[in-house]
Amino acid sequence: MIHSDSPCLRIQNIFQRHYQRSTLFIDDSGAQSFDDDAWRLERSQRNRMALFDMHKPVIAQIHGRCLAGGTDLAMLCDMLICADDARIGFPATRGQGSPPNHMWLYMLGPQWSKRLLLTGDQLLGSDAATLGLVLKSVPADRLEAEVEELADRLAQVDTDLLAANKRIVNLGLELMGAKTLQRLAAEMDARGHLAASREEFRKQVMEHGIRKATRMRDAPFGDGLARP
């Protein structure tokens, strides 16, 4: 990703997120202090922030399931285009923690951010477009062509101007506290890791495996969809 930000390359970055199922990472290395956990999360966060900070535009192409860490990455891109039937959300808030990157507030506003994060429910791609979480949704068989068409249009513009116009919008987000909120998000995730439900989920994973533990966690929520 950093290499593709070279000023010598006239190319736009298309970041594809496609999950057949939710992917979860369980750290079973032993207990960490709150401070150690927060620092670990911030170190990982700095790598993801390259998407936000790099000069060239990055388009997120979302199909399938974009859940948990997938949303951390996709929402740092400059524009998000998804399939109508994609599913976007952070179901780990039901038992494990909080998003370690937080752009939800800026893209959805406070009420819908809370609606999704307080339940772990997901949005279909078409609904995500209606609410402004993504730029646009299209039928799945049109997704790649739609993203390529936008990338081709961006490629007609001088890279210095692309960088300038991306940067001023992102600086506006920074003036609204976006960079500070990311650090606070890492700390809130570390705080969430102290919840009794996280330890219970870890035990379920050790006993039943990740798939069954996830099904047990999600069973009370039905189809897990939030409908505008």
Language-model features and meaning:
Residues 49-162:
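Crotonase-fold acyl-CoA enzyme core
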Residues 2-24, 124-125, 156-228:
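C-terminal alpha-helix plus adjacent terminal tail
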Residues 30-31, 37, 41, 144, ...:
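Short, structured helix-loop boundary elements
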Residues 42-45, 144, 148, 166, ...:
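Generic alpha-helical structural signal
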Residues 38-40, 78-89, 178, 212-221:
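Short, charge-rich amphipathic segments
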Residues 37, 45, 111-112, 163-164, ...:
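Short alpha-helical segments used as structural interaction elements across diverse proteins
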Residues 11-63, 101-102, 214, 218-228:
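An acidic, glycine-rich surface segment that forms the CoA-thioester-binding/catalytic face
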